[in-house]
Regions:
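Conserved N-lobe ATP-binding subsite of Hanks-type protein kinase domains
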Residues: 20
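Activation segment signature within eukaryotic-like protein kinase domains
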Residues: 107-108
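C-terminal lobe helix-coil module of Hanks-type protein kinase domains
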Residues: 169-267
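Protein kinase catalytic-loop region centered on the HRD/HxD motif
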Residues: 112-123
Length: 302
């Protein structure tokens, strides 16, 4: 088993262009942790290295149960790493196509409240997507934590790096096309994409998002409607169309407002209306009951 500092690496949780995250065991504290390690090909880049460590400091500064917390930093073989909470429930990506509307809307609202914590501390995430939203199955109901601040606007501004960061399918038009400054409403857009994907199992604009369209196409495109057979209230469809608006001014203005609207528009009635026709199982059970009653009555008459 590979060792990093005092931490025993047990398996890879995820990897990106700049870093890899491992599940690890801390023998001194007898607990599981997650360790993020800067990629070897970036370790000698001073700007990237500082941005990596700045992410650790930023996560440490944000004290909230909705954001993963950093507990330690270190360097091994000239590669910096930092140690975070290990959240055992996986990520929202594993829920795509596998949750009912009620659960989807609960998880999306939880994600919105987690993103609001970042915004309250002046942080715009810029890469909200299912794999960066962790599920804490140890809480009831399941809570969502936000992770990976490596693309946060504050870190990019401080480092001087000008490369557009984010995942195209979840990027707001103003972020994808760099049409000027952007704020937390870009994260609200991403939350809209995540919610649509949780409900339908697919992204509203395909894997490339609006970033693959021309500027003109992006400005006139609108998301497809949510299929009616999902039983999702009409208010949710309208809310998602607003969240995915090209104009940030037409979106919910905060992540919390988006989350609140998800819960209030849903009204708690998520299941599609059931058919009034009896199912085959019910018919068979009724037939069995009639048969048994008839048999008993016949025996008593004898």
């Amino acid at each position: 088993m590979r060792k990093l500092g005092r931490y025993l690496l047990e398996g890879r949780l995820g990897a990106g262009s700049f870093a890899t995250v491992w599940k690890a065991y801390d023998p001194e504290l007898d607990t599981d942790v997650a360790v993020k390690v800067l990629a070897d090909n970036w370790a000698s880049n001073a700007d990237v290295r500082e941005r990596f460590l700045a992410e650790a400091r930023l996560l440490r500064r944000i004290s909230s149960p909705r954001v993963v917390r950093v507990h330690d930093v270190g360097v091994q073989d000239d590669r910096p790493y930092f140690v975070m909470d290990y959240v055992p429930g996986g990520t929202l990506a594993e829920k795509i196509g596998h949750c009912r509307p009620a659960e989807a809307l609960h998880l999306a609202a939880e994600a919105g409240y987690a993103v609001q914590v970042l915004h309250d501390t002046g942080v715009v995430h810029r890469d909200i997507k299912p794999s960066n939203l962790l599920l804490d199955a140890g809480r009831t109901p399941t809570a969502v934590l936000v992770a990976d601040l490596g693309s946060a606007k504050q870190l990019a501004d401080a480092s001087g790096l000008t490369v557009t960061t984010g995942t195209p399918a979840y990027m707001a038009p103003e972020q994808a096309f760099q049409t000027g400054g952007f704020d937390g409403r870009a994260d609200v857009y991403a939350l809209g994409v995540v919610t649509f994907e949780l409900l339908t199992g697919r992204k509203p604009f395909g894997s490339g998002g609006r970033a693959t369209l021309t500027t003109e196409q992006a400005s006139t495109s609108s998301p497809p409607a949510i299929p009616s057979d999902l039983g999702v209230p009409n208010g949710i469809d309208r809310l998602l169309r607003a969240a995915l608006s090209v104009d940030p001014g037409d979106r919910p203005q905060t992540a919390q407002a988006f989350a609140d609207a998800l819960l209030s528009q849903g009204g708690g009635e998520w299941a599609p209306a059931r058919s009034s026709r009896p199912t085959r199982l019910v018919v068979w059970l009724a037939a069995i009951v009639v048969y048994l009653v008839t048999a008993v009555l016949t025996w008593l008459v004898r």
